[in-house]
Amino acid sequence: MLTKFIASVALVLAAIPAAQAQLPDQQTVTDAYVYLLGRAIAIRQEQTDLKEPGIAYNVIKYNPAGSADFVNPNLDVAYLEAWIAVDGKTPVLLEVPEVKGRYYTAQILDEWGEVITNINERNYPSHPFGKFAFVAPGSTAKVPADAVRIELHSRKAKLLGRVELKTDPAGAMALQKQFKLTPLGKPDIKPAAPMASFGNKELIGVELFDNVEAVLASALDVSPIAAQMQAKVRDIGRQARDPGQRQALDKLIKEEVVPKFLNYAVTRSGVFQNNWLATLGTGNYGADYWKRTSANLVGLWANANDEVIYFVATRDADGQPLNGANDYVLEFSAANRPDAVVNAYWSVILVDVPDYRVVKNPLNRFNFNSDSGLKSEADGSLKILFAPRPNAAVPESNWLPSAPGKGFSLTLRTYVPKDLVKRGEWFPPAIKRLK
C-alpha cells in the first residue's frame, strides 16, 4: 500500500507544471545577476569596439587629444586604446616611449574589469619604457630578451594609455603615436562571447543567463570567490532555460533585482563626504563583485587607486542638485588645495546632466587642471566658480561656465594621489551656493 501511495504522489508531482516549481530565493538571483552583469558589460564594450571602422585586435586606436566629444571626457590627456589578443604560442609586444616631465601610464585590464598592471616609471622603475611582452596564462612562448614578460589573466586584455597634455598638447600627441602594439605571429583569436544587446537605461533581463557556459569559459575571473559565484550563475542559468520558470525569473530580475543594484551603484558603491562621491577601492576588487559591477556600469575600465581617484558631485552643500540657474563656489583652504595631495596632477570638469557632455561656451573653457594658472586668494586659498556668468566674488580666470537653468555634475580627478587621499582622509570641500 505504501509503495503504491509513494508512486501515486510521484506521478502527481511530475504532472505539476514547471511554472509552479520554486524559483531560487531573491538574494541568490540578485547575487548571480550582479556578478555576471560585470562581465556582460565588458563583453558589450568588446562587441561595440570591434564594430568601429578600423578597429581590430592588437591594433591601437589613437584618440584625439583633449577631445570634448566624449561622455564626461578627460581633457587632460592624450588617450590610446586597444584590445590585446594572444594565444599560447603567440605573445603581443607593446613598445612604450620614454616620457619625461609628464604623467603617463599604459593600463592593462582583464575582461572582468580587474587591473592587471599599469606600465609606468612607478611600477617598473628599472624598465619604465621600452618593450613589454604580453603572454597567455601558462604560456612558455619565447619573448624578446629586452622585453618585460607580463602574463595576462586570459587570452584577451584591454589597453588604455594616457599621456598628460600639460601645456604642450603637440608634444603629448607625438608621444602618444610612439606607443606601438605588435603580435609576434598570428594568434588564434576567438570572437567576443555571446551576449544579448542591452543599454544602461534598460539593463539586460533573464537573457543575461543565456549561454552561461560560453560566457564563463571566455575569461578567467581572479576573484577569490569566483568558483562560488559561478556555481550560483550556472544554477540560475539552468532555471532560465526552463520555459516554465523563465518568465517569472525575468519579472523578478526587472522588478526587484535591477532596481536594487542600480540603487547600490548610485548611492553605496563609493564613499560619500561633503556631497562628493569618491571612487575608493576601484581597479582591484577582491571578493567585492558588487563594487566591480558598479564601476563597470558607471565607468568601465576604472583604474587602480594608486593611479587615480575620482570625486564626483551632483549636489551642493545643502544637498540640492547643482543647477545652472545658480552660482556656486568650490573653495579650498591653503592647506587643503588639491595640488598638495597629488604626486602628478589634478583636474576638475563640469558636464551637463543627464547627457554628461561639456557645456559649450564662448571661452571654450570646459575644465581646469594643475597647469591652468588659476589665481589664488591673498591667504593662499583657491576659489573656483561654477556659474552661467562671471561673479565678482571669484576671479574670472577661475570661472567654469555652466548652462543657464540646466543641471550639471562635477568630476575632480586626482592623479597619483598621496596616501591620505587613498585612505579616504581627504575630500574636496562642499560646493557652496552663492546667495
PLM feature segments, named:
Residues 21-435:
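A compositional/structural signature for long, glycine/proline-rich flexible linkers
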Residues 1-21:
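Gram-negative bacterial Sec-dependent N-terminal signal peptides
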